[in-house]
Amino acid sequence: GKLITYVIAYFRMNNMIGKLIINGNFQKILVFLFPLALYFNTLNNSFVLDDNIVIKKNEYVTRGVSGIPDILKYDTFKGFLKSENSATAVTGGRYRPLTLIFFAFVYEFVGENAFIFHLLNILFFSLLCLSIYLLLARLLKSKFPDYANPISFLATLLFATHPIHTEVVANVKGLDEIFSLWFSVLAFLCILKSIDDNKK
């Protein structure tokens, strides 16, 4: 009797879990929370490698909001290298003002609190993963309506867990790469929405 009760409970639980996993809203929540759990261990990291160049030792970022005009005017490394030829001190130019402006705003409010910088990096990576899920589901829905969500869910989890992203998420400076892909995915989603709206 007890064995049958356990077996029935097991299958009911599996059925409930199965229904949750194929539920699109639940998948969205998981896709957002999974990277947070995956990279939670980076929250206690300090600034490392290029984080010092773009945040901690960058004169323009450490000025906070008042450094934004110089961030917009000069190469990314200028605030760190403090020389007129900063663009040539390192091979190739590095004009990436968006992330430095974001860092300046964060620095204005929390200073050198690496925990907050790492937390924001993980949150933006989670938003990127959610956006990738939405894009894949939208692209697959017309050809594979029954499988679009599960395929998108698994593909996004694979993307989130791939070790190649560790450097981007664990180093705060990697936010420029997260932003690049995230804004590209958002642009693609907007294009698809515009196409759908024009069909109506």
Predicted regions and their residues:
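Cationic, low-complexity basic patches in intrinsically disordered or flexible, solvent-exposed regions
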Residues: 3
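Polytopic membrane enzymes that build or remodel cell-surface glycoconjugates and lipids
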Residues: 7, 12-200
